[in-house]
Amino acid sequence: DWESLIKLIKEINENIKEYKSIDFECLVVNDASTIAQPELIKPNNIKSLQILNMKQNRGHARCNAFGIRYIFKNKNFDYLILMDGDGEDRPVEIKSLVNEVTKNTNISIVAKRVKRSEGPFFQLLYQTHKIITYIFTGKKINFGNYSCLIKKDVEKLHSAASLWSSYSGTVKLFLKDLSEINSIRGLRYFGPSQMSLFKLLIHSFSIIAVFKYQVFLRSTFIIIFLAYFSEYLGNTSIFFQIFIVLFNLIL
């Protein structure tokens, strides 16, 4: 979405203008867009603007992984801010990320979602997703891509195989110390949200799959619990036991 990208870059430029002593470089990962790339003009507060073109659209997770790996191997940097390019990660919150990481330069920052812009039905599904993720992994994952990573943590993440399927899951698995800022999920600059029910399910599975060992252990305890109370739960117990077994086989 080049139209969104152009607006995003302008807003980033506006929100970083007060940080005169910090050099900001912008790397855009193009997920094989079929729309002709327009001429992009580098704003005055951004030191450099570079486009990395993917050969195929393999999804945002692979784009993230590709960009993170490229930056670690090819760029000289202290911090990496990762964000979506459609406006849902609000550029105004870059200030909060920078200010927070300035207070403690040795801990990566994630943008915790405290409010979303979707309708009530989708928000209900999203809360269900977070509960299921917590039950099976024991991890409270309340953030997406929007984050500020210290270089040491980028080094930990860039070679992780799970990064190619889930950024937030990989961050939670490999980084034990994380700080956070409160973040409001913004509206897309152009068009409706691209997060459908199917994509939300894929998103959930991708996160849970990162924690296969924890999922197996927790599933075992849940099955034992259901079997013990099967006399009271009846066919419901059998249904959930079968579901959990199939769930683990899929992972």
Can you say where each PLM-predicted feature lies in the sequence?
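Short hydrophobic helices that act as membrane-entry/anchoring signals
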Residues: 122-137, 199-213, 217
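Short beta-strand/loop segment that forms part of the nucleotide-sugar
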Residues: 9, 22-33, 52
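Membrane-embedded multi-pass helical conduit in multi-pass membrane proteins
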Residues: 216-251
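A conserved acidic beta->alpha catalytic loop
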Residues: 1, 30-39, 87-88
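Short, well-formed alpha-helical segments that are part of the catalytic scaffolds
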Residues: 1-17
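Catalytic donor/gating beta->alpha subdomain of glycosyltransferases that bind UDP-sugars
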Residues: 101, 155-214
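Acceptor/aglycone-binding surface of glycosyltransferases and processive sugar-polymer synthases
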Residues: 54-70, 79-82, 88-165, 187-191, ...
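Residue-level recognition of the N-termini of beta-strands and the immediately preceding loop/turn
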Residues: 22-26, 49, 78-83
